[in-house]
Amino acid sequence: MTDRYARQILVEQLGETGQQKLEKSSVIVVGAGGLGSPALTYLAAAGVGHLGLIDMDTVAASNLNRQFLHGERDVGRSKADSALDTLKAQNSEIEIRAFDERLTVENASTLLAGYDIILGAVDSFETRFAINQACVTLGTPYIDGGVNGFSGSVLYSHPPDLPCLNCIFPTGSSNKRNTGVLGTTAGTIGVTMANLALLTLLGLPNPLRGKLFLYDGLRMRADLIDIQRNEACPVCGIG
């Protein structure tokens, strides 16, 4: 155990046993942008032993207000390659794999198989639904995040016990990209996703079981609202 984790090992709910759990754990994050940057950064810093990331986009100047895995010199580069370099420089003691390809319904299960938890950190509902469908098929917990302006949400999904993304956001939901987003909103939601992943990996109580986390940065408040499975859901339902 290296000194880099010494301070978090002092946390009562973690300790050396918890750190060893993290070292043996695996998480994959779809998206290395505004949500993926904080989520991946803090999962790597915490010592999650096996990280994966998927992103087929390239770095644009308009990304730099919130996507801090990338810098000015990375504009035009593959986000997957840029994020991989940054994360390796941050923590060389963990395994990190990067996939520079588009995730689709057809390849999602193959790309996401074998991980303990899957994080969806993308702005496309089409991709989020593809991740969700794969997670239902694989039986893997899914943490989904979304942001818009000063607002954001986090959903923890693990059917058949908990609602899936499709139960809460029907497939007709807006797929509009290029909505306004503040860097601090993306940071708050991305860190919340990472924190929830750590709670799950450590076997600690999950406050988002059957709840949807809603964040309002304008009013500086967060709320948990009750959610339920849709038994007629075409993805996870029984009907």
Positions of PLM-derived features:
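Adenine nucleotide-associated cytosolic modules
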Residues: M1-G239
